[in-house]
């Protein structure tokens, strides 16, 4: 009998408490970068019933109306009714932002390499912290993402679209999805085993109505029919009721959905969150660079699955390590791939910032529905413009091996 395995990933909607916090943090970051592209920002947000606290460290010449940014973001998500227990115009906003530590700033503003006299513009900026970051790509989907997280994101995006268009009028902003995919003995996805959708709703609607709408208008609209069969389980609002939600039901905090933000647990994670951080924070920028590398390696046909690890020391520009793992799927040795990556990509913080143009206010749009594999927005780390340079570098290195 062939061995089959299950893998599960989840996503959450923009109205989930943790995602509200992420979006507020990134909205503040974008508002500052729009006026001061050189700003250093680390903005954290906590939300709960009737209150938003914004705290962290910022170095900027710009003035931003934090109160207005917070309220506008909450309204865009859909929390505009008092009965939700959390609404844009009545919520209390409590900012507490201070200047970045000078001890950290001296290493970011002048990297170790620059202090040692290595005259290169890209040696000026040091990494904002030590740490390790991962990027991943796999040929399971057109966007080169694992299928479970791809489907999970699509489900909650579809829910939000139906809510905002008014097509399903009883929907409220908070929601979660979870998809279990069955893989065959060759690690290829063959079917969807279980779909879980929990969606906040108005009190009057029946569970039968919710179930019917979720299956017909969400699940079947998103998941290709060949993945669904008579054994696929649909678990819709399994508790039986989800009226109280959002920050009224649970507190939310920036950076608590790092697996949702990346690969749904299918690949490793270095532990650093993204939202509210400018690109000198390698937790964010190097994770984007690692995805960029992995996606271009797979798109180039150099591997069918690739995981890239980058690691940094605070105040040092060059990464302390670069690793490529293709899980036995590469067409050449991983040492050649690593050498090609070092040739093609400048992985110093300033190099990443220039390569991906990361001083722009592009971050709020990433704060819900995933930072990787997005097909609905244009993100530079999803571009495939390094396929040819990588292919050429690998060919040259292979000849010289």
Curated annotation (Swiss-Prot):
MF terms (GO), sorted A to Z: ATP binding; magnesium ion binding; methionine adenosyltransferase activity
Database matches in InterPro entries: ADOMET_SYNTHASE_CS (IPR022631), S-AdoMet_synt_C (IPR022630), S-AdoMet_synt_central (IPR022629), S-AdoMet_synt_N (IPR022628), S-AdoMet_synthetase (IPR002133), S-AdoMet_synthetase_sfam (IPR022636)
GO biological process, alphabetically ordered: one-carbon metabolic process; S-adenosylmethionine biosynthetic process
Major subcellular location class: cytoplasm
Location of the region described as Flexible loop in the Swiss-Prot/TrEMBL record: 100-110
Cofactor(s) essential for the protein: Mg(2+); K(+)
One Gene Ontology CC term in the entry: cytoplasm
Subcellular location: Cytoplasm
Keyword ATP-binding in annotation: yes
Stored NCBIfam families: metK
HAMAP family, A to Z: S_AdoMet_synth1 (MF_00086)
Family: Belongs to the AdoMet synthase family.
Name by which UniProt lists this protein: S-adenosylmethionine synthase
């Amino acid at each position: 009998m062939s061995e089959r395995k299950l893998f599960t990933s989840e996503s959450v909607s923009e109205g989930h408490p943790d995602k509200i916090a992420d979006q507020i943090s990134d909205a503040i970051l974008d508002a500052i970068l729009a006026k001061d592209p050189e700003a250093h920002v680390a903005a954290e947000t906590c939300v709960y019933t009737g209150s938003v606290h914004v705290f962290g460290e910022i170095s900027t010449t710009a003035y931003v109306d934090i109160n207005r940014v917070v309220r506008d973001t909450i309204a865009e998500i859909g929390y505009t009714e008092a009965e939700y227990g959390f609404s844009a115009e009545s919520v209390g906003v409590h900012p507490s932002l201070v200047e970045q530590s000078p001890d950290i700033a001296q290493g970011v503003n002048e990297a170790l390499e620059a202090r040692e006299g290595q005259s290169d513009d890209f040696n000026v900026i040091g990494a904002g912290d030590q740490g390790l970051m991962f990027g991943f790509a796999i040929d399971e989907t057109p966007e080169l993402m694992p299928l479970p997280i791809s489907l999970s994101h699509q489900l909650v995006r579809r829910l939000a679209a139906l809510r905002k268009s008014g097509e399903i009028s009883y929907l409220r902003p908070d929601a979660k999805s979870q998809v279990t995919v069955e893989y065959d003995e060759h690690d290829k996805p063959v079917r969807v085993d279980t779909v879980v959708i929990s969606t906040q709703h108005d009190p009057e609607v029946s569970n039968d109505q919710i179930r019917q709408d979720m299956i017909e208008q969400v699940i079947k609209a998103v998941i290709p029919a060949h993945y669904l069969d008579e054994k696929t389980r649909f678990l819709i609002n399994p508790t039986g009721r989800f009226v109280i939600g959002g920050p009224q039901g649970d507190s939310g905090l920036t950076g608590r959905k790092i697996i949702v933000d990346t690969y749904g647990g299918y690949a490793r994670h270095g532990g650093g969150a993204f939202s509210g951080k400018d690109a000198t924070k390698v937790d964010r920028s190097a994770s984007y660079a690692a995805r960029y590398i992995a996606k271009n390696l797979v798109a180039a046909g150099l591997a069918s699955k690739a995981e890239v690890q980058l690691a940094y020391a605070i105040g040092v520009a060059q990464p302390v390590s670069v690793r490529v793992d293709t899980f036995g799927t590469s067409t050449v040795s991983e040492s050649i791939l690593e050498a090609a990556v070092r040739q093609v990509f400048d992985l110093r913080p300033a190099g990443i910032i220039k390569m991906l143009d990361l001083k722009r206010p592009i971050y709020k749009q990433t704060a819900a529905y995933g930072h990787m594999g997005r097909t609905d927005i244009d993100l530079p780390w999803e571009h495939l413009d390094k396929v040819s340079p990588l292919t050429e570098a690998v060919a040259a290195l292979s000849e010289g091996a």
